[in-house]
Amino acid sequence: MKILMVCLGNICRSPLAEGILQHKAFEAGLSWSVESAGTNGYHTGECPHPLSQKVAKMNGLDISKQRSRKFVAEDFERFDKIYALADDVLDEIRRIARNKFNPEKVDLLMNELYPGKDLDVPDPWYGPEPGYHDVYRMIDSVCDKIISKYSANPNPHRTVGIGTKPSSK
């Protein structure tokens, strides 16, 4: 399964989401690929925000090797599921995707925990460190739900590519 986490700049929230979900998938023995992107290109090529890295490290994750990239319409062909971390990000994904947008494939991340509530993961960019811890806890909880939901498959090591049938590894 290929999952893309998307926030605004791809330096605070989505790098945490990528790191957390990739770690949880690995721990669960799932052969998932998790990546992240941002809807703007202001930080392309940059590593995650220092406070995102710090909070990840405090929780046993190293996200320092990640690099920001911009979300592109072709991501709809590359990923099985795309999670937006905020409503404005979801709107921008729709705009970028145009005719490739598939509502079955894209949702707000927090809808996994609170279906239909359309809650945002707040952007900690302007705040102090405690906001990054809050964001980490929110994302950690929803990633547990994602693992539980998608690993219920009787063959959890399957890989699914766009336009291909599930296959065993």
Predicted segments, located by residue:
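Hydrophobic structural packing positions in well-ordered secondary structure
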Residues: 7, 56, 83-84, 139
